[in-house]
Amino acid sequence: MNIVTKLLAGVALLAAANSAFAGETLDRVMENKAMVVATNSSWPPQSFLDDNNEMVGFDIDVSREIAKRVGVEVSFQTPDWATLTGGRWQGRYDLGVGSVTPTKARAQVIDFAGIYYYSPYVYVVHKDSTAKSVEDLNGKVIGVETATTSEDFINRKLEIDAPGLPPVEYKLTPGEVRTFADSMLPFDDLRLGDGVRLNAVIAPEQTAMNAIKNGYPLRILDGGYAFREPLVVIDEKVDPEWTAKVGGIIEEMKKDGTLASLTAKWYGKDYSAD
C-alpha cells in the first residue's frame, strides 16, 4: 500500500469513527420517542419527590418542557452527583438537568447545551447568630455540599467557564470547612444552633430560602452574594447535533418567557435573566 493510499485509508477510518458519533443521542431519542434525564431526587425546589412519590421541581418542569418541544416523552434517573457531572454516561442518559455549573474541568468531560438560569450563592447563619457581615464568619466553621461550586469557592478554587461574569471575590477565611454529601445536610446541622456544629453554610439562595420556608430557624446574611453562578443543561460529549438542538430550545424558552415563568413559580422571582 503506497503512502497516498495509506493516508486516504486513515482519513476514511477517521471519518467513519466521527460519523459513528454524529447524531448518536439525537437518533436514539427520536427512535425511542423518549429521552432519559439525569437529575437529583432530594434537592428541593429544584428536583425532589412529592407526597405521591412523583418527581417535581424546577429542573423537572424544565426537563418536561424540553421533551415537549423535542416531541418525545421524558423519564428520570437519579445518579449520584459525580456520575451526573463526570460524563462517560455510555448512553444511559440523554440529558442532565441538575443545576450544574459550567466549570473548566467539567467542560473536558461533558457538553454544555445552554445556560437556563442563574443562582446567587449566599451565606446562611442560624437566626440567633450574632454575625452581621461576612467578616464576622472569619475563623468559623463553614458547611458546604461536597463536589460543588460552594466547596470550590470556600477553598478559593472556583473556575466558572462562562463569559461575562464578574471576577470572584474571596472575603472569607474559614477556621474549618465541613463537607456534606447532600445539599440539605449542612442546613440540618446549622438548624441545631449557632456553633453547635456549624456557624454558617454557603449555598444557593433558592435552596436557603426553601429551607427557611420549611421552618428551618435560619437567615441569610445581609451584605450581598458570595458569588453568582450560571447553571447549564448538560449532555454526553458524543453528539454536537443534539447539544445544538437542546441549546436552541433553551434559547427559545428564554425568549418566550417560559424560563422566567418557571423560576418565578418555584423561587418567587425571575432567575433566568443574563
Show the residue positions of the predicted features.
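Short helix-initiation/N-cap motifs at beta->coil->alpha
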Residues: 76-86, 168-192
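Extended ligand-binding regions for polar small-molecule ligands
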Residues: 24, 61-69, 128-131, 135-149, ...
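Ligand-binding clefts/hinges and TM-proximal coupling segments of bilobed small-molecule sensing domains
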Residues: 24, 149-172, 177, 216, ...
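Acidic, polar ligand-binding/catalytic clefts
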Residues: 64, 68, 73-136, 219, ...
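Bilobed "Venus flytrap"/periplasmic-binding protein-like clamshell domains
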Residues: 36-44, 55-68, 101, 122-181, ...
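Extracytoplasmic small-molecule ligand-binding "clamshell" domains
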Residues: 23-99, 245-246, 253-256, 265
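A ligand-binding cleft/hinge motif common to bilobed small-molecule-binding domains
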Residues: 83, 100-108, 152-161, 188-227
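Periplasmic-binding protein-like
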Residues: 41, 117-125, 171-172, 205, ...
